[in-house]
Swiss-Prot record:
Keyword check for Ligase: yes
Sections of the chain in a coiled coil: none
GO MF term set: aminoacyl-tRNA deacylase activity; ATP binding; proline-tRNA ligase activity
Protein name in the entry: Proline--tRNA ligase
Native source species: Gloeothece citriformis (strain PCC 7424)
Catalytic class of the enzyme: ligase
Keyword list, A-Z: Aminoacyl-tRNA synthetase, ATP-binding, Cytoplasm, Ligase, Nucleotide-binding, Protein biosynthesis
GO BP, sorted A to Z: prolyl-tRNA aminoacylation
Cellular localization per UniProt: Cytoplasm
Annotated PROSITE patterns: AA_TRNA_LIGASE_II (PS50862)
Amino acid sequence: MRLSQMLFVTLREDPAEAEIPSHKLLLRAGYIRRIGSGIYAYLPLMWRVLQKVSQIVRQEMNATGAQECLLPQLQPSELWKESGRWDTYTKAEGIMFALEDRQERELGLGPTHEEVITFIAREMIRSYRQLPVNLYQIQTKFRDEIRPRFGLMRGREFIMKDAYSFDTDPEGLKKTYQDMDKAYRNILRRCGLAFRAVDADSGAIGGSGSQEFMVLADAGEDEVLYTDDGKYAANVEKAVSLPPDEEPSPFKNYEKRETPNTDTIEKLAQFLKCSPTVVVKNILYEAVYDNGMIVLVLVNIRGDQEVNEVKLQNELVKLAPQYHAKTIIALKVPDESAQQKWAAKSLPLGYISPDLGDDYIQGSKEIASKFVRLVDKTVVELKNFVTGANEKGYHVLGANWGKEFKLPQLIVDVRTAKAGDRAVHDRTQTLQSARGIEVGHIFQLGTKYSHAMGATYTNEQGEEMPLVMGCYGIGVSRLAQSAVEQSYDKDGIIWPVAIAPYHAIVVIPNINDPQQVEVAEKLYTELNAAGIETLLDDRDERAGVKFKDSELVGIPYRIVTGRSLKEGKLEVVERATKKSQDIPIDEVVSTIQQWVKAAL
């Protein structure tokens, strides 16, 4: 392709809307252009990158025996109501674009396709002889992000590969899951990315287990915790660890003590001259289920630890059937205005006790009359602890479970693991922290959707059984931008060869020099004929502008028909290292060919 004929405009200044390096560079280098909030046009250079990523994804998926298809973007609400996710996606998380057609039928623009694929399986799969089967698509998805940001990282429209597998039993699912794990690792390696596969929370998709694939980058939105021995890695939302040991309590006798102005753990520990590890803090949450029921939740956790609200939400979802609900649509620490809806009397905030009475709740049809009481594992064995006295300005000291306070029945792990904690699998290992960009997520769904939607098959004994499912997503457009976030310098993008829009760029410093033009044209033709995808910068621009643009755009190899031409050589510059060497004209094609082959 000739740059003189391409829609190609670069920017010298960083756009105001861009926050992270990859977003700035893709805009400046003319790869994307913003159309609206979270909506971007993929311009010719970007489209080539996306096609290359898609092709690698396609090859690795096909190698596992998966079959490509294309599913509808418009999805009837009835399917989502069958699975129980319509309210979750339109009200709770609120990420689905919902609309009505002219017959007032509800539809959603697909953020994911579990319901559609389960409907297809229900209609078409009858026998175990048809299994296993794995279907995938590469398609535009839509999500109504609250705060679209970072360009293609968190947009409202994006390109994704999603796959859905059907097996006869959990063992078959595990094999498919392992195949997908291997395929995803191959995809990321072939794209030239440094990554970690980590344990993850399944979120609204559900299922028994899941794993995320994180591209490591300082601007990553996710925190990854891992051990140096390579045996553990998890998203912080899912991570488990051993907390620091608690210090011995200095309070041997039970007493109530005045503790003015100690409504935080830090103030309390300073006032009592004790460690936060001997304090039981009691945190009040307000949970709203998908049927509108409000439930008040009291969590007891050690004073030096924080509640992981993803873990907490998962525990509360397990309790949903008790309230004739399916999921949580909101979870928050209630402020004073929220408390007015249900508080029968003023709460002693900052001084709440583990036995806060249910009489604080003014129950109704929409408000559960009793607290859900959850105790974190960090305080179950705590002795002679400090905690609130249910009276402003007072705490109790030297308290114990089974004596002064009844230990709640629901013992859970809702603490946030953090860097420096000891690993569960090996106490000598400590958790390290890194930032990551989630580009892939694989799930073992089990029978969640097939049970809900009646998707079954007949086994060898003639019994009707639910299909065992898995789902596997990888963000094509997000992966492409992640590559930039992982590899750039002060001058621009440094594309991995495998997904660069072009392998090489031939730059003519002076288009008024017939020899430079002639050699460049011949080389351009020969490189493309040799399978090296090549750009020709034949624009009527200053040489300095052309060199700056080539570095900004990030093409792996730059060939210049400049000064060394008089000696029968061309200057070849490697973008990643900026290493420059003069190579005889007749050796340039074979040299670039070898470099590209080695990099792929």
